[in-house]
Design a protein with these regions (language model features):
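Plant-biased intrinsically disordered, low-complexity terminal regulatory segments
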Residues: 2-3
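Acidic/glycine-rich C-terminal interaction modules and beta/coil loop segments
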Residues: 52-53, 63-65, 69-159
Length: 159
C-alpha cells in the first residue's frame, strides 16, 4: 500500500503531467543530486513543457527503468529528470549529469516533458537548449571518466 506522502507526490505528478500534456508550462521543484552540477535538487526548479522534438542532450522528465534491471519482468518504473544520451529506435537512454555509471531506459512514449529552463532560488532563469548550455553539457559528458573527482571538488567548494 502507498503511504500518504507517496500518494500526495503521485497526485502532484499526475496533475503536472496533465497540465504539460495540455500545453501548459509547469514549474516543478526537483530533489536529489543526480543532475549536479547543472540542476541542484532541493534548491532549483525546472520549467517543463510538452516534448515536441527530442534530441541527444535534452533534459527530460521520463518514466524509466534503471540499467541494472533491464532483464527483469514487471520492474517498477520511476520518474526521473535526466539528460538524453542516446536513442536506439524507439528506445531512449538517459543519464543524470551527476551519475557516474547509472543509466535509465524508456520508450519515446515514456518521455512526458522536456525541461526548457531551470529556475534558481533568486528567481533567475537559465534556459536549456542554448548553444552555451549544450556545449557545457557536451563537455561534461566527455569528462565522464573524471566526473567522480570533479563532483567531489564541486561539493567541497559549494559547502
Amino acid at each position: 500500500m502507498m503511504d500518504s506522502a507517496k500518494k500526495s507526490d503521485a497526485l502532484i505528478m499526475a496533475e503536472a503531467l496533465r497540465l504539460v500534456n495540455e500545453g501548459v508550462s509547469v514549474t516543478f521543484p526537483v530533489n536529489g543530486c543526480s543532475m549536479l552540477p547543472f540542476i541542484v535538487g532541493g534548491r532549483d526548479s525546472v520549467i517543463l513543457e510538452k516534448p515536441v522534438d527530442l534530441c541527444v542532450g535534452d533534459v527530460v522528465l521520463a518514466l524509466t527503468i534503471p540499467d541494472n534491471v533491464l532483464h527483469l519482468e514487471n520492474v517498477e518504473k520511476h520518474y526521473v529528470i535526466h539528460r538524453i544520451v542516446a536513442f536506439s529506435g524507439e528506445n531512449v537512454v538517459l543519464m543524470g549529469d551527476g551519475n557516474l555509471v547509472q543509466r535509465e531506459y524508456c520508450k519515446r512514449t515514456d518521455v512526458y516533458a522536456k525541461v526548457i529552463g531551470v529556475v534558481r532560488p533568486n528567481g533567475k532563469k537559465s534556459l536549456q537548449g542554448t548553444f552555451a548550455e549544450r556545449c557545457a553539457a557536451k563537455i561534461w559528458y566527455i569528462l565522464l571518466p573524471f566526473r567522480r573527482y570533479l563532483l567531489w571538488i564541486y561539493k567541497k567548494v559549494k559547502k
